[in-house]
């Protein structure tokens, strides 16, 4: 009986998603659209844009990084919100 109970507990833990992870787009300007699961505890997505000799560059990912002046940064807190 104890073995059956232990087996049920292990199966429940394996099958249930015990922690939620944020999903964010993570491609740069010219790359195909992709998204990824963020590390545990990372609850934000960002969209960062700046201009250089190539034109407007867009970078997307998990988190909300510090940026220098002249760089447009948008952070959000829902799945795939940084497109």
From Swiss-Prot:
It comes from the Eukaryota. One of its GO terms (cellular component) is extracellular region. One of its GO terms (molecular function) is acetylcholine receptor inhibitor activity. It is found in: Secreted. InterPro entries: Snake_3FTx, Snake_toxin-like_sf, Snake_toxin_con_site, Toxin_cobra-type. Coiled coil: none annotated. Disulfide bonds join 24-45, 38-62, 64-75, 76-81. Keywords: Acetylcholine receptor inhibiting toxin, Disulfide bond, Ion channel impairing toxin, Neurotoxin, Postsynaptic neurotoxin, Secreted, Signal, Toxin. Expressed by the venom gland. Its main location: secreted. Residues 1-21 form the signal peptide. Binds to muscle nicotinic acetylcholine receptor (nAChR) and inhibit acetylcholine from binding to the receptor, thereby impairing neuromuscular transmission. Belongs to the three-finger toxin family. Short-chain subfamily. Type I alpha-neurotoxin sub-subfamily. This is Short neurotoxin VAN-10. The lineage of its organism: Eukaryota, Metazoa, Chordata, Craniata, Vertebrata.
